[in-house]
A protein has these predicted regions:
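Short acidic-glycine loop/turn motifs at beta-strand connectors
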Residues: 234-238, 303-308, 369-373
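Glycine-rich phosphate/pyrophosphate-binding beta-alpha loops
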Residues: 319-320, 383-397
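Peripheral (often C-terminal) accessory segments that flank ATP-dependent C-N-forming ligase machineries
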Residues: 405-524
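ATP-binding N-terminal substructure of ATP-dependent carboxylate-amine bond-forming enzymes
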Residues: 1-171, 175
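Short acidic, glycine/serine/threonine-rich loops at helix termini
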Residues: 44, 84, 152-155, 228-235, ...
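A long amphipathic alpha-helix within ATP-dependent nucleotide-binding catalytic cores
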Residues: 269-293, 311, 323-378, 417-452
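Short, flexible loop/turn elements at secondary-structure junctions
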Residues: 144-145, 223-225, 287-290, 301-305, ...
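Active-site nucleotide/adenylate-binding loops and adjacent lid/helix of ATP-dependent enzymes
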Residues: 166-282, 332-344
């Protein structure tokens, strides 16, 4: 019954859909459930993960439409000053008018459970949400869609603007590889999904035999998040088991012994914990792409409920961790030498996902390796994984779109304001230093105001901050720096870092290195 009711609700959404822009201009109630409904043992590896519910606060900018009403639910109450900060960004809308159309609700539950589960466990809260929404004028958005979000959609009788959870597999590591193959998009050699360490070693040995030149293999939990579920298997220490020097059985045994020495991308991970997740989540192995000059671009797309593919953006991602596997931030747009190729591949992948029945946002991560060529610079692009959900590049781009009311130009891969001005940005979720710990949201607002670090609505340039709730405990902050040129965006980011360092230098006798580069990766 639940599945048929959910499909009926999604069909209603398809019937009412015209376009992304016109949909937001209608008289609508938007329910925002920013739940990271991911494996909680994996998400716990991310510092301040509970505050990632703030990443969808860009949705408040939708209140610029005077007919829109919005309900935003969080696990713990949001500081009022954070809400005020976003509402003050609205161009041409009186603050009080927007605030009257915003309803904030909370579960008052800081446990590791996902926010959606917390809501479902509180039937009175569910009923209050239901009463606040207007029938036939409402829809629900979320960070990622699972069976919990589907259940909440059905209980509220509100359509969910997200893929059916039955399609979740296509956003996993193994599912991504199958979509790449269907789309004829280049991707690294790798394995099918395995469920135990013995089969993992077997798959790694077979991959090594197919590619004897490999120096490293990536081991990925099938449902890892932001690269936190990735590990590196170094092959050099077991050189005696190389394909041309040993039997297959010898190679498998050598890899099995070496698995205990995987290099994990997060300091919290151990082989004992990682190996225990393989029977629960599954895992794959994949060839590690080497290269002297290597980048990590991505493309973001949107599948309308009618199945049309829209390319939203491209980015050059900034990755960290021992082997560059952890997402830290991004530049918009991606390098001009490959951004149009990213778009073409993104459309192919979007079409394959739409054929499976997926709707709403998807992102595709790539690895780009510079190739020597007599005619100039060329880049080899290999697709790595699909995110069938909102991701780290969603909120900065949507913030840019909502604040400037501009448009993405598919012919160039650039973003233009209504006045024809090109816009660029640098964004991160991981500006994190120990000396920032103890800063309260109010303190940050004082610093923003005093040093004029705010977003200027007249020039449509400046900084937009998020993850403010993670500052006090974790010293962690997110921001999007919008400029009229790549250099201006980079300068804005560097200015914020310089000011925060100076403002907090008296709080601590030392400053640790930020996990995000102190100077973003240079634009080409």
């Amino acid at each position: 019954m639940g599945n048929s009711k959910f499909r009926q609700l999604q069909n209603n959404l398809r019937d009412r859909w015209l376009s992304v822009d016109s949909f937001d201009q209608d008289d609508r109630d938007i329910l925002v459930v920013p739940s990271l409904t991911l494996d909680q043992r994996e998400i716990k590896k991310v510092d301040g993960f509970l505050h990632y519910e703030e990443r969808l606060l860009f949705s408040l900018i939708r209140l610029r439409n005077p007919h829109t009403r919005l309900i935003y639910i969080t696990a713990q109450p949001l500081p009022p000053i954070v809400i005020d900060y976003y509402l003050q960004l609205l161009p041409g809308i009186p603050f009080s008018h927007a605030r009257d159309r915003l309803l904030l609700m909370t579960t008052y539950d800081g446990s590791l459970k996902s926010l959606t589960q917390k809501i479902l466990e509180r039937p009175r809260l569910v009923e209050r949400i239901r009463r606040a929404l207007r029938p036939d004028k409402s829809y629900m958005v979320c960070y990622n869609s699972t069976y919990l979000e589907r259940e909440l959609s059905v209980q509220l009788d509100v359509p969910l603007l997200a893929p059916d959870p039955d399609l979740l597999y296509w956003g996993t590591k193994s599912g991504s590889r199958q979509i790449f193959q269907l789309s004829d998009v280049p991707h690294p050699d790798g394995s099918e999904l395995v469920w135990n360490c013995e089969d993992l070693a077997e798959a790694a040995a077979q991959l090594w035999e197919r590619q004897p030149q490999l120096r490293r293999i990536v081991v990925k939990l099938n449902e890892g998040f932001s690269g936190e579920g990735n590990a590196i298997l170094e092959l050099n220490p077991i050189a005696q088991a190389k394909p041309e020097q040993a039997s297959h059985a010898t190679r498998v045994r050598a890899i099995q012994q070496r698995l205990e020495h995987l290099r994990f991308q997060t300091t919290y991970e151990t082989w004992k914990n990682f190996s225990s997740r393989i029977p629960e989540l599954g895992a794959i192995v994949e060839a590690f792409i080497e290269g002297e000059e290597k980048r990590s671009p991505s493309v973001q797309g949107y599948i309308t409920p009618q199945g049309k593919i829209n390319i939203l953006s491209t980015h050059d991602q900034i990755l960290g961790g021992p082997d560059g596997q952890i997402y830290l931030g991004c530049h918009f747009p991606a390098d001009e030498t490959y951004r149009l190729t990213l778009q073409e591949m993104g459309i192919k992948i979007g079409q394959a996902l739409a054929a499976k029945g997926a709707i709403e946002r998807y992102g595709v991560d790539f690895v780009a390796v510079r190739q020597p060529h007599s005619s100039g610079v060329t880049w080899d692009l290999q697709a790595i994984e699909i995110n069938l959900r909102k991701g780290g590049t969603t909120h900065p781009f949507m913030t840019l779109k909502f604040l400037t009311n501009g448009r993405y130009d598919l012919s160039t891969g650039l973003f233009h304001t209504q006045q024809g001005k090109d816009k660029y940005y640098v964004a991160t979720d991981n500006l994190q230093k120990d000396c920032y710990r103890g800063l309260m949201p109010n303190d940050l607002m004082d610093i923003i105001a005093y040093h004029k670090l705010h977003f200027d609505s007249s020039t449509r340039t400046g900084n937009i901050f998020h993850l403010m709730g993670a500052l006090s405990e974790f010293g962690k902050l997110g921001l999007t720096c919008i400029g009229n040129s790549p250099q201006q965006a980079e300068n804005l980011y560097n200015q914020v870092v310089k000011v925060l360092d100076a403002e907090t230098s008296t709080q601590s006798n030392y400053t640790t290195e930020s996990s995000y580069p102190s100077t973003p990766i240079a634009w080409s």
